[in-house]
């Protein structure tokens, strides 16, 4: 899995409560992603068997069904591993030099 910013944010949202089912709008808010980014990402995670999904039957007439997503057991394991590796890479990355102050020679 390629660990991009959106992937990292979605996995972090899932891992805040790994057993809890999450629906799309909930994940959009938690990960701060637009639907055009989130849903293709969820589809890829499903294809990789890291996320499972199920449709909820509306309880009242007129309610729209919701599709709930949940990390699989393997998804939890991979998400934790990938997030730990991403964190370690950030800690090892050399600090980026700052810009010199205006008028300085540096």
What are these regions (language model features)?
Residues 48-62:
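Beta-hairpin "wing" of winged helix-turn-helix
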Residues 60-83:
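Basic, amphipathic "hinge/linker" alpha-helix immediately C-terminal to the N-terminal HTH DNA-binding motif
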Residues 55-57, 73, 97:
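Short alpha-helix boundary/capping motifs
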Residues 42-46:
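Short, hydrophobic-biased segments on the C-terminal half of alpha helices
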Residues 77-106:
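Amphipathic alpha-helical dimerization/coiled-coil segments
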Residues 1-37:
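N-terminal helix-turn-helix DNA-binding core of bacterial DNA-binding proteins
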């Amino acid at each position: 899995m390629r660990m991009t910013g959106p992937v990292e944010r979605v996995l972090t949202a899932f891992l805040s409560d790994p057993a809890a089912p999450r629906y799309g709008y909930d994940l959009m808010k938690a990960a701060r992603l637009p639907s055009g980014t989130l849903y293709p990402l969820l589809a890829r995670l499903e294809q990789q068997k890291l996320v499972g999904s199920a449709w909820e039957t509306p309880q009242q007439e007129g309610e729209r069904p919701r599709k709930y997503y949940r990390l699989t057991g393997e998804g939890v394991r991979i998400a934790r591993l990938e997030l730990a590796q991403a964190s370690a890479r950030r800690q090892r990355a050399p600090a980026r030099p700052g810009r010199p102050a205006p008028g300085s020679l540096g």
